[in-house]
């Protein structure tokens, strides 16, 4: 694996101590933590309190979402008349929890409900193939989509012609216009949506429907699945999303979650993860991947809906253990494909967009490999297989959709292609700010287009390493770690804070047994020492300058405060 570069540029600190001082006084945060608050745009005491203590005032009236009245009335009618309802969800850690959430609520309302998640191999969304399966297998009067449906006009028209209403709940951006149904909610819809917060995940949109249907519109017992999807689907952890996540974590810590399946997943994770201490990082790295792993590894994703809807602890544990097994297999496969991708890309890719061609990569793991490449190179990345299918990821703060639109303008998407079999297909993509999926692209054209994308890295071929504030080693203590935790949880749109610490001496360098991690001891000019760790930097051992500037986050590990390095360069005095 290539070693991190020691020639990266660092961005200017976003906030000075003077700018942070008023927020520090108003919130009782330390100066560096207050600087993070200001750097994220919460630059008044009132806004800072919104970040630190989000309330249900951030959970907006669901009827402010265009189309909510119509869809809520149609669902109420179906429930009252005992019409058969099918909830059709996407196969990931957004669509599956959203399907479970809606099913749990409607069943509690005595509705006649079935659920169905298609296999990942069938492709994203409500295709004609899936529409025919739905009609033959379930014969519903009403289909409610979760986390999909906005672009599936043909299937919606066909079902309508067969007497089946389709209610679409979705959050994905689409250029195809409004689907042909009067029952459609999507905060990202393009026809005059005025809902105040457009970054809800698919499960979040399904929850807004539940709010509209409920006599208790703020029902924290349902927040756990919304939080799981919000973190797992890489949507912005700000505003309304932030409220749901913080409320759900408090609920879990108080052991108030009634979701038997979610608790079973936490039990199977084990180690340092428990209901009493679970945080957003645990959800993103330990819980959501287990839900995604089922579909990614070709197993039946409907088992996870059962996991999140069952009241049987023994059945929940049985399924949770299977998700654990599949996730372990997924990790092994992802690592192998990542190593193959790095060999193909080379140690120093220069194109603004990284494109990794992995002929045999299943679409289920392409996004995971892309995310690891983004972490290594800090650049938007597409992973494509031999069928022209794949996934993309982008660094936090680098929107992916404008890049995909550039590729569309170059003629790669939105065009018909004829396959070797003679079948005519349309190359297309979908997704949101940080993640996308695509299919039927011409691989050679995509590889050539990577060098022509605009808005890529700056001079030196990399994006500057973001910095929230500059601090001295002497202020990094347990209080700062606690304050940084208070400013969390962190995720998309609210990344873990990055601090610039200048002119440090490197006293020790030890490579981990895996060869991946580099453990350090560093010291400032006054002789104060601190441990540090730099992930995926084992190959840099022995090459660090004697004195360095670092960009790092702060954490508490094994009873000591430590730095987690993100970048280092020769000290600039």
Predicted regions: what is each one?
Residues 469-531:
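Accessory interdomain/linker segments of ATP-dependent helicases and helicase-like nucleic-acid enzymes
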Residues 527-542:
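Beta-strand/loop nucleic-acid-binding surfaces
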Residues 66-179, 184-185, 190, 332, ...:
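N-terminal small/polar loop signature for handling phosphorylated ligands or for N-terminal nucleophile
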Residues 349-350, 355-470:
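Glycine-rich, acidic loop segments that terminate in or are immediately followed by a histidine
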Residues 37, 90-92, 144, 170, ...:
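Divalent metal-coordination and catalytic microenvironments
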Residues 444-449, 514, 539, 544-573:
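OB-fold single-stranded nucleic acid-binding module
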Residues 1-81, 286-325:
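Cofactor-/ligand-binding subdomain signature composed of acidic, glycine-rich
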Residues 33, 80-83, 91, 178-349, ...:
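A structured phosphate/pyrophosphate-recognition subdomain
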């Amino acid at each position: 694996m290539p070693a991190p570069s020691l020639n990266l540029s660092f961005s200017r600190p976003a906030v000075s101590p003077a700018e942070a001082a008023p927020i520090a006084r108003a919130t009782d945060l330390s100066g560096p933590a207050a600087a993070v608050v200001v750097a994220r745009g919460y630059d008044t005491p009132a806004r800072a309190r919104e970040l630190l203590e989000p309330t249900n005032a951030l959970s907006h009236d669901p009827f402010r979402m265009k189309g909510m009245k119509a869809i809520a009335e149609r669902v109420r009618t179906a429930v009252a008349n005992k019409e058969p309802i099918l909830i059709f969800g996407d196969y990931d850690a957004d669509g599956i929890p959203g399907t479970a959430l809606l099913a749990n609520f409607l069943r509690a309302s005595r509705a006649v409900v079935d659920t169905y998640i298609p296999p990942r191999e069938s492709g994203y969304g409500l295709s004609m193939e899936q529409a025919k399966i739905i009609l033959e297998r379930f014969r519903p009067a009403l289909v409610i989509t979760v986390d999909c449906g906005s672009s599936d006009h043909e299937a919606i028209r066909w079902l309508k012609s067969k007497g089946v209403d389709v209610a679409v709940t979705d959050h994905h951006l689409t250029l195809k216009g409004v689907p042909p149904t009067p029952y459609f909610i999507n905060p990202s819809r393009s026809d005059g949506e005025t809902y105040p917060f457009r970054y809800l995940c698919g499960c979040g949109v399904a929850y807004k429907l539940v709010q509209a249907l409920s006599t208790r519109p703020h029902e924290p017992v349902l927040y756990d699945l919304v939080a799981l999807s919000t973190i797992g689907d890489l949507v912005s952890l700000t505003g309304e999303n932030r409220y749901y996540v913080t409320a759900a974590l408090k609920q879990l810590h108080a052991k108030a979650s009634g979701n038997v399946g979610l608790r079973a997943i936490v039990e199977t994770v084990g180690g340092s993860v428990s209901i009493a201490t679970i945080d957003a990082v645990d959800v993103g790295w330990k819980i959501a991947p287990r839900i995604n792993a089922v579909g990614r590894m070709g197993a039946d994703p409907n088992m996870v809906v059962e996991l999140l809807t069952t009241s049987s602890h023994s059945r929940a544990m049985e399924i949770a253990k299977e998700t654990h097994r599949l996730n372990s297999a997924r990790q092994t496969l992802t690592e192998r494909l990542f190593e193959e991708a790095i060999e193909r890309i080379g140690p120093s890719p220069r194109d603004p967009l990284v494109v990794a061609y992995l002929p045999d990569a299943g679409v289920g793991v392409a996004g995971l490999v892309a995310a690891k490449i983004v972490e290594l190179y800090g650049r938007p990345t597409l992973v494509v297989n031999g069928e022209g299918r794949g996934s993309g990821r982008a660094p936090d703060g680098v929107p992916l959709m404008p890049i995909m639109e550039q590729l569309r303008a170059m003629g790669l998407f939105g065009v018909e292609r004829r396959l070797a079999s003679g079948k005519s297909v349309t190359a297309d993509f979908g997704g949101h700010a940080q993640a996308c999926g695509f299919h039927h692209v011409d691989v050679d054209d995509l590889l050539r287009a990577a060098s022509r994308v605009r808005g890529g890295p700056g001079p030196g071929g990399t994006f500057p390493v973001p910095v929230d504030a500059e601090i001295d080693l002497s202020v990094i203590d347990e209080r700062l770690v606690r304050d940084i935790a208070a400013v969390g949880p962190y995720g998309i749109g609210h990344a873990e804070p990055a601090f610039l610490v200048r002119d440090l001496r490197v006293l020790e360098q030890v490579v981990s047994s895996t060869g991946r991690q580099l453990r350090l001891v560093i010291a400032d000019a006054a002789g104060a020492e601190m441990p540090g760790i730099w992930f995926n930097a084992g190959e840099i051992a022995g090459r660090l300058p004697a004195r360095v500037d670092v960009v790092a986050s702060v954490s508490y590990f094994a009873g000591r405060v430590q730095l987690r390095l993100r970048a280092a360069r020769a000290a600039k005095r």
